[in-house]
C-alpha cells in the first residue's frame, strides 16, 4: 500500500532565511508547470510523484497547465470538476496542502492572431506553441522568491521540446525539469490518474482487470544547461518570440564581429545595433581604430584628448553642442581619469545591457596590466573582426537586429 504523504515543514519557507537553490522545496512560492495534450493525467501523476519524493518533497502551491482548446476542456472536466475531479481527489486522498490551481491557470496556446488553437497542425501553429510556452516560462521565472518545477511528460513531442528549451533559456539554479515514468499497463490507460491508497480496479483495453493501487510512478530528473545569465536584459522581460530568444543566446557563442558606421552614427555588435551617444561612440571608435591598426592599448591618463576630438568632430560636425562641450572640457583639462572612466563605464554598460553578459564580452573595453600601468582597449577583438566604414548603414551587407534598449 502506498504511504500517506506528509508534507511536513520541508516544503515551507523558513522565516528569515534566504532560499537556497539547492533546496527548491524551501522557496515560499513553488510552481508546477506542465504541458498537456489530450491526457490531463500527466498533471496528477507528476504531482503524486513529487509528493512521494522524500522528506523534502517539492509540494507546489501553484500549478499551471499549458495546452490547446480541447486539452483545456478535458483538464477542466477531468481534473477540476466536482466529479470526477481527480486533482481534488488526489489532494484529499493524500492530505496535500492547499494548491492554487483555478481554471484560469490553464493557459491556452494562441495563434499569431490571438485565436486559441484546437490542435498543433502546421508550422505556424508550432511557432505559436513555442512562443506561448517561452512566454509563460519567462513569466514564471521572473520572481526571485519562486522555484519552478517543469514536467515534460505530456503534450506533443514538439511541446515537450519547446518547454525543455525554454527552461534552458530562462531556468534558474532553483528550477527543475522532470519526466514521469508510469508502470505498465497504467501508462496509457485513460482511467488512470495516480496510484490510489485503497484498491481501485480498472479494466484495461484488452479487458484485463488491474488495481490502480499497484501502479508505480517514478520521477526522473532531467539535467539541463542554463543560459539565462547570458541573455540581454530586455529578453528577460516582455514577450520576445522563441526564435528571437534562441538567436540571442546563439549570438553569445558566435565569432565576434564589430561594425562601426561613422557617418550614420551606428554601432553594430554581434549583428545587433547598440545605441550609443556621439560622445561614447567617438571614444569607442577611437579605441576600435587603434585596435584595427594594431596599436597598443592605452593608459587612461596618457590618452590624447585631441585624437578623440578629431573623431568626435568627424561624427557630428564642429557646431554640435555636445562636441563644443567636450572640446571645452578636454582642451582645458586634458584627458582626465574621471572623463576616461565615465566614457568606459557608459560604453560597457550599454554593451552589457544590449547584448547580454556573455555575448558582450568580446566587445567590452577591457583592462590589462597592474596599476598604475593598467592599459585599456578592445582586447577581445582581433583587427580582422572590426569593420569601420564611413558609408551609410544601408550599404551594410547584413541587416542588424535593432535593439529595444535605450541608454
Predicted feature descriptions by range:
Residues 1-148, 161-407:
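Long, low-complexity, Lys/Arg-enriched
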Residues 152:
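Conserved SAM-binding loop
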Amino acid at each position: 500500500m502506498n504511504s500517506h504523504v506528509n508534507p511536513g515543514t520541508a516544503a515551507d519557507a523558513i522565516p528569515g532565511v534566504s532560499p537556497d537553490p539547492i533546496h527548491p522545496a524551501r522557496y515560499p512560492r513553488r510552481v508546477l508547470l506542465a504541458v498537456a495534450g489530450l491526457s490531463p493525467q500527466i498533471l496528477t501523476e507528476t504531482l503524486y510523484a513529487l509528493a512521494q519524493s522524500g522528506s523534502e518533497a517539492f509540494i507546489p502551491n501553484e500549478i499551471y497547465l499549458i495546452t490547446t482548446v480541447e486539452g483545456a476542456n478535458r483538464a477542466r472536466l477531468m481534473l477540476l470538476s466536482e466529479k470526477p475531479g481527480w486533482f481534488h481527489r488526489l489532494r484529499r486522498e493524500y492530505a496535500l496542502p492547499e494548491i492554487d490551481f483555478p481554471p484560469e491557470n490553464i493557459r491556452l496556446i494562441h495563434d499569431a492572431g490571438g485565436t486559441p488553437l484546437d490542435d498543433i497542425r502546421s508550422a505556424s501553429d508550432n511557432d505559436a506553441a513555442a512562443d506561448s510556452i517561452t512566454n509563460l516560462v519567462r513569466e514564471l521565472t521572473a520572481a526571485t522568491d519562486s522555484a519552478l518545477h517543469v514536467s515534460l511528460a505530456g503534450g506533443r513531442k514538439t511541446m515537450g521540446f519547446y518547454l525543455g528549451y525554454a527552461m534552458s533559456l530562462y531556468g534558474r539554479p532553483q528550477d527543475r525539469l522532470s519526466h514521469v515514468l508510469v508502470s505498465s499497463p497504467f501508462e496509457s490507460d485513460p482511467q488512470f490518474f495516480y496510484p490510489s491508497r485503497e484498491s481501485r480496479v480498472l479494466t484495461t483495453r484488452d479487458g484485463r482487470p488491474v488495481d490502480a493501487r499497484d501502479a508505480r510512478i517514478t520521477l526522473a530528473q532531467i539535467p539541463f544547461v542554463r543560459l539565462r545569465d547570458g541573455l540581454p536584459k530586455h529578453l528577460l522581460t516582455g514577450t520576445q518570440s522563441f526564435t528571437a530568444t534562441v538567436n540571442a543566446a546563439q549570438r553569445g557563442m558566435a565569432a565576434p564581429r564589430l561594425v562601426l558606421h561613422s557617418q550614420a552614427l551606428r554601432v553594430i555588435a554581434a549583428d545587433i545595433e547598440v545605441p550609443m551617444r556621439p560622445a561614447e561612440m567617438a571614444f569607442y571608435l577611437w579605441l576600435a581604430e587603434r585596435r584595427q591598426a594594431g596599436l597598443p592599448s592605452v593608459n587612461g591618463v596618457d590618452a590624447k584628448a585631441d585624437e578623440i576630438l578629431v573623431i568626435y568632430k568627424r561624427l557630428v560636425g564642429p557646431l554640435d553642442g555636445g562636441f563644443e562641450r567636450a572640446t571645452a572640457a578636454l582642451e582645458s583639462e586634458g584627458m582626465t581619469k574621471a572623463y576616461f572612466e565615465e566614457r568606459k563605464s557608459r560604453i560597457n554598460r550599454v554593451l552589457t545591457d544590449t547584448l547580454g553578459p556573455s555575448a558582450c564580452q568580446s566587445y567590452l573595453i577591457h583592462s590589462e596590466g597592474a596599476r598604475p600601468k593598467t592599459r585599456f582597449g578592445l582586447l577581445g577583438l582581433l583587427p580582422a573582426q572590426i569593420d569601420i566604414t564611413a558609408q551609410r548603414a544601408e550599404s551594410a551587407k547584413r541587416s542588424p537586429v535593432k535593439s529595444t534598449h535605450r541608454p
